[in-house]
Amino acid sequence: MKKAIALAMASVMAAGLLAGCGGSAANSTAASSEAASSEAASTSTEAATEAHTVNTTDPITLTISWWGGDARQAAYEAACKAFTEKYPNITVECTYGPWNGWEEAQSTALAAGTAADVMQVNWNWLFQYSGKGQSFVNLNDYSDVLDLTQFPSNALDACTVADSLQAVPVAMSGRIYYWNMATFKKAGLDHYPTTEQELLDAAKTFQEKLGDDYYPLAAGPLDRMIMMTFYLESKYGEPWVTDSTLNYTVEQLQEGLEWIQSLEDNHVMPDLKTMNAAGDKTITDGQAWITGKYAGIFTWDSSALSASQNLPDDAEYVVGDEIKWGEAANGGFAKVSMGMAITQSCEHPVEAAALINFILNEKEGASIMGTQCGMVCSKAGQEYAKEAGAVNELILEANTKVMAFVDQPFDPCYESTSLKDETNGVYSDVFEGFSYDQYDSAEAAQILYDGICEALA
């Protein structure tokens, strides 16, 4: 696994992955029409080794799974319905849910061979659950149905593991701040914080004018881990990981943890004990977020809509700016936020490839999906979404800001289950234990260091 990740990341970095997806508009041709090209031509390339034709007569059932909020659910379901109208012989069954617990359920399904035919996947799943190509099919084999020319080559390279294109990239994504300006204005502030000092000043104002229950920011364990990573990368200017080696010492991790603690101490954000006591599945499901007591979050640009869906109309929900914490670099990373893959257990991979192509590349599907999964990588899909007015301006603004700011590479081991799992992962253990005063900063730093090094080994 370690070698596969290192080789993949070397390819990604050389190609300049952080340049992002999209690009100039391209005329989309139906992927299925490309199958009409001669067999000789198709066998002379790395694309499909045989011509494929979508079955339009026999009854076929496909399954598809994804995670996300209500808006994403509605878009996927509408796109799948439109697909079945194009192919009346195909039925599409949908499975979806919130992120909490989703990866655990999907990893179990992959191991049991019961996963959906088409899966929305996190990028690191390709390495973690299919490091030898055992879980997902090689989409190069279906390039006469799924138009791979619509995707940037560097983004396809990022999804190539074990010499197999195991997913197509849906979007590039990074973390940024979103603010509820109604709460800021209630505190007498007319602008969101753009520097560390402005954030500290806002926290003081919130506490003085609104009370102890109001905070400019709320952050869970993973949010804190990513914020700390941005902070350390900005201060020291080093990538988080190089060649499967963590570039930060235990002492530097301790410094980062103490910085996170300073945000709690200065009323920037509540401690995790306070947040967990509410029993909310996510921050944005909780009353503290809905009522404006938590006035900011640090989340993926692709999550803009799901984060805002529970807010009242007068919340004045806006995307903020990235905050530069140090002088050595901007810090921070972007990644292939999610991909679409076909599982090895799928009995109808040609039709599954047609479903992915419909959702991402074809006019009707892409117009429905818009930016529900972030700013789409498909050139044709992005153009169709724009023509349909389905590009959410907030997501576009957030993604543009992220891509212009971040300057560090992303290592897929960062999201290994052993680190990221919400119940038993190292990040949750460290940040909850530290926030609950179960660990001091030195102990927490050592646990974090050891856990990361073990995941990288």
Please describe what each predicted stretch is:
Residues 124-134, 154-191, 219-242, 265, ...:
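Periplasmic solute-binding protein
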Residues 203-204, 245-277, 322:
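Glycine-centered hinge/linker elements that transmit conformational signals in sensory
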Residues 57-69, 90-95, 117-118, 215-217:
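Short, well-ordered beta-strand elements
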Residues 82-151, 182-194, 287-296, 310:
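Extracytoplasmic "Venus flytrap"/periplasmic binding protein-like
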Residues 46-54, 122-176, 200, 252, ...:
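Hinge/lid segment of periplasmic solute-binding proteins
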Residues 334, 397-452, 456:
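C-terminal capping/gating helix-and-loop segments adjacent to ligand/active sites or protein-protein/ligand interfaces
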Residues 85, 91, 187, 266, ...:
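Extracytoplasmic/periplasmic substrate-recognition and gating elements
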Residues 135-138, 305, 338-421:
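Mature extracytoplasmic/periplasmic domains
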